[in-house]
């Protein structure tokens, strides 16, 4: 197991993947990380849809105009949903779950990239939420936060450069 300090430095967004499928045990570990993530008041107001059907992945990639076409090359997509009525912190809780999955994927040697869907859409005014809702039969009580593209890395990215950390953005006691 990788030490977290190293994992945090190594995890980068990957947008190029090989065609190799992801092992079912690895998918389960990734989802386990999400299910174990902390939530506001222990509500666990999120849902996750695991998509490995190539046609559905391609449709998800077209749910917004910009920044999602690379999803078509991923063997796996995980759609993160939340229930805004059940918990007003659904965005935060879903975000914590999503990054937990990304760190777990990195620990398994897999690449991932967050694709923002909440508040995004098509140039005709159709929201990504509406498009994804139609593809995956999502009920009205749930809202789409993001889609994670996950796969075996087709490219290598350098770890975060320690010298470029913005320590000047950290303040003690007061800004």
Give the ranges of each region predicted by the language model.
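Acidic, surface-exposed loops and disordered segments
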Residues: 1-175
């Amino acid at each position: 197991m990788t030490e977290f300090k190293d994992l945090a430095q190594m995890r980068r967004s990957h947008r190029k993947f090989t065609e190799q499928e992801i092992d079912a045990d690895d998918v389960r570990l990734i989802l386990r990380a999400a299910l174990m993530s902390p939530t506001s008041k222990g509500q666990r107001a999120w849902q996750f849809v695991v998509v490995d059907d190539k046609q559905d992945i391609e449709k998800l990639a077209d749910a917004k105009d910009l920044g999602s076409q690379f999803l078509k090359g991923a063997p796996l997509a995980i759609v993160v949903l939340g229930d805004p009525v059940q918990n007003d912190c659904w965005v935060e809780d879903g975000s914590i779950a999503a990054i937990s999955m990304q760190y777990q994927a990195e620990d398994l040697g897999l690449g991932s990239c967050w694709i923002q869907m909440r508040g995004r859409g098509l140039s005709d005014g159709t929201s990504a939420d509406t498009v994804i809702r139609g593809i995956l039969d999502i009920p009205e009580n749930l809202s789409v936060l993001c889609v994670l593209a996950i796969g075996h890395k087709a490219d290598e990215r350098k770890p975060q450069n320690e010298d470029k950390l913005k320590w000047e953005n950290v303040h003690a006691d007061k800004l």
